[in-house]
């Protein structure tokens, strides 16, 4: 500000000195990032109870598929829809356990 009295004209002049115009319409191009989408996998297994074939469609990383493969070989078994309904209709409502 100039002088001891503040006027709107003085403030406006000082703002013009501080604020510089920004050109928002520019020719700059931004590179688009490519995102790696996990590959879809088809998994075939058999029902633990009736041994009917099961088919699952999964989307995962190769490491995730490898982990699922290990689980299916070691300690996880799958049930078909019919066997699953039968198993759960004959038990008390209980989740995640025998």
From Swiss-Prot:
Localization annotation:
Host cytoplasm; Host nucleus
Under the heading InterPro entries, the entry gives:
Papilloma_E7
Q: Where are the annotated segments for E7 terminal domain?
A: 1-37
Which key words are in the record? Answer: Activator, DNA-binding, Early protein, G1/S host cell cycle checkpoint dysregulation by virus, Host cytoplasm, Host nucleus, Host-virus interaction, Inhibition of host innate immune response by virus, Inhibition of host interferon signaling pathway by virus, Interferon antiviral system evasion, Metal-binding, Modulation of host cell cycle by virus, Oncogene, Transcription, Transcription regulation, Viral immunoevasion, Zinc, Zinc-finger
Q: Where are the zinc fingers (unnamed)?
A: 47-83
- Where would I look for the motif LXCXE motif in this sequence? 24-28
Spell out the Gene3D superfamilies in the cross-references.
Answer: 3.30.160.330
Q: Which family does it belong to?
A: Belongs to the papillomaviridae E7 protein family.
Q: What does this protein do, in the record's words?
A: Plays a role in viral genome replication by driving entry of quiescent cells into the cell cycle. Stimulation of progression from G1 to S phase allows the virus to efficiently use the cellular DNA replicating machinery to achieve viral genome replication. E7 protein has both transforming and trans-activating activities. Induces the disassembly of the E2F1 transcription factor from RB1, with subsequent transcriptional activation of E2F1-regulated S-phase genes. Interferes with host histone deacetylation mediated by HDAC1 and HDAC2, leading to transcription activation.
Regarding domains, what does the record say? Answer: The E7 terminal domain is an intrinsically disordered domain, whose flexibility and conformational transitions confer target adaptability to the oncoprotein. It allows adaptation to a variety of protein targets and exposes the PEST degradation sequence that regulates its turnover in the cell.
The entry's protein name is: Protein E7
User: Where does this protein come from, organism-wise?
Assistant: Bovine papillomavirus type 3
């Amino acid at each position: 500000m100039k002088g001891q009295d503040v006027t709107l004209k003085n403030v406006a002049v000082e703002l013009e000195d501080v604020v510089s115009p920004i050109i928002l319409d520019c020719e700059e191009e931004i590179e688009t990032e490519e995102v790696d989408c996990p590959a879809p996998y088809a998994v075939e297994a058999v029902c633990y109870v009736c041994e009917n074939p099961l088919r699952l469609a999964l989307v995962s990383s190769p490491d995730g598929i490898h982990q699922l493969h290990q689980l299916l070989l070691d300690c996880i078994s799958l049930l078909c829809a019919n066997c699953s309904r039968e198993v759960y209709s004959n038990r008390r409502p209980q989740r995640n356990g025998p």
